Amino acid sequence: MCDEEVAALVVDNGSGMCKAGFAGDDAPRAVFPSIVGRPRHQGVMVGMGQKDSYVGDEAQSKRGILTLKYPIEHGIVTNWDDMEKIWHHTFYNELRVAPEEHPVLLTEAPLNPKANREKMTQIMFETFNTPAMYVAIQAVLSLYASGRTTGIVLDSGDGVSHTVPIYEGYALPHAILRLDLAGRDLTDYLMKILTERGYSFTTTAEREIVRDIKEKLCYVALDFEQEMATAASSSSLEKSYELPDGQVITIGNERFRCPESLFQPSFLGMEACGIHETTYNSIMKCDVDIRKDLYANTVLSGGTTMYPGIADRMQKEITALAPSTMKIKIVAPPERKYSVWIGGSILASLSTFQQMWISKQEYDESGPSIVHRKCF
C-alpha cells in the first residue's frame, strides 16, 4: 500500500445521490441518483439489447418504463442486491476503474447498524476484491472538510438529517440525533402546496420538476411571519419558472413556506423538533465542558442546507435557545453539498491515514468484524 501512484477511491452513498471520485481531487467526478430501475414490461423489440436493470441517470431518463427503487432509505442501506449494482456502476461505468486495484473509502450514516458495516466490508472484499477499504462516518468527514476536528455537524441530505457532535475527531454516539425530515419531504411538501395554487404535479417525472423549482427558487426566511405579511401585501417575492412544455408558473410564499418546515416540522404533520432545536438538544446531551466548542463550531452540511438564508436563521434560532453569553457561530461552507465527499478525499490522501486502511489480508484473517476494530 505504500506506492503513492494508486489513488484511493472515495464513494459517498447518499439516500438521493451517490458521489464518487478519486482521493486528492477537490470535487467528486461522478454524481448520480442512487436508484436502480427494472423494466415494468417485457421488451417487444427483438435484439434491442434490453437490460434487466438500469442505474443512476440512465434509470432516471428511462423512468417512464421502469419501476424505480432507492436501495438507501433514510441514509441506511436496505437492499444489498441493488446497492451492489450501484457500486458496480460506480466503479465500472462512472469512474471506469478496476476496484481490485484501488483502496476504497466508503461513507456511512451515523448510528449505522453494526451488521450493515460488516456487510459493506464483505461486499467490497469478496465481490469487488478491493486491496483495502475503510468506512467513515459522513458527518465526521464534513467536519474535516471544514478544517476542524471538534464541532457539531447538522448534516441534512435527501433522505435523513442528523446532528452529530464531534470531539477531537470522534463522534459522540450518545448525543447523535436523527430527524427523518430531509430533501425528499420538502419536495413532497412543495408539490402539495403548489397543488393548492392550482398547479398539479403528481407523477415521479413531475416530482423532478418540483425538485428543480425547490433548488432554484426556495429560501429560508429570517422571520417567517413577517415574510408571510410581505408576500401577502406585495408581489416583490414572486418569481416565475418555465416548465419543460413552455408553460410559465408563478411561485410566491411557497418559496419560503417549503423550507420553513425544517424549522417547523408541524407543517408536514410531523411531531418532531425543528433542525435548530434538534441541534440544541444534541449539544445539551454532551458534557457541559465541551458545549462551548460545539456552539462556536456548528457546521452545516448536505444538499438540504443549501437554501439561502438558512445560516442566518440557524444563528438567530440557536442564539435564542442558548445561554445569553454564549458565542455562537454557524459555519456554512459554499461547497457543503459535497463536503462529506471532500472530507473523504482529504482523509484518504493523508499520509498519516495510510496505516488505517483495512487490508485484504487483515480481512481474510479476521472476517467482516474487523471493521469495528479499525473504523470508529
Curated annotation (Swiss-Prot):
Main location: cytoplasm
Expression tissues: All cells and tissues of the developing embryo. Later in development, expression is higher in midgut, brain, nerve cord, and gonads.
Matches recorded under SMART domains: ACTIN (SM00268)
A GO term from the CC aspect: cytoplasm
Annotated keywords: Acetylation, ATP-binding, Cytoplasm, Cytoskeleton, Hydrolase, Methylation, Nucleotide-binding, Oxidation
InterPro entries xrefs: Actin, Actin/actin-like_CS, Actin_CS, ATPase_NBD
UniProt PTM: N-terminal cleavage of acetylated cysteine of immature actin by ACTMAP. Oxidation of Met-45 by Mical to form methionine sulfoxide promotes actin filament depolymerization. Methionine sulfoxide is produced stereospecifically, but it is not known whether the (S)-S-oxide or the (R)-S-oxide is produced.
Residue stretch(es) of the prosequence: 1-2
Catalyzed chemical reaction(s): ATP + H2O = ADP + phosphate + H(+)
Compartment(s) where it occurs, according to its Swiss-Prot or TrEMBL record: Cytoplasm, Cytoskeleton
Note: In Drosophila there are 6 closely related actin genes.
Function: Actins are highly conserved proteins that are involved in various types of cell motility and are ubiquitously expressed in all eukaryotic cells. Multiple isoforms are involved in various cellular functions such as cytoskeleton structure, cell mobility, chromosome movement and muscle contraction.
Protein name per Swiss-Prot or TrEMBL: Actin-42A
Organism for this UniProt entry: Drosophila melanogaster (Fruit fly)
Lineage per the UniProt record: Eukaryota, Metazoa, Ecdysozoa, Arthropoda, Hexapoda
UniProt gene name: Act42A
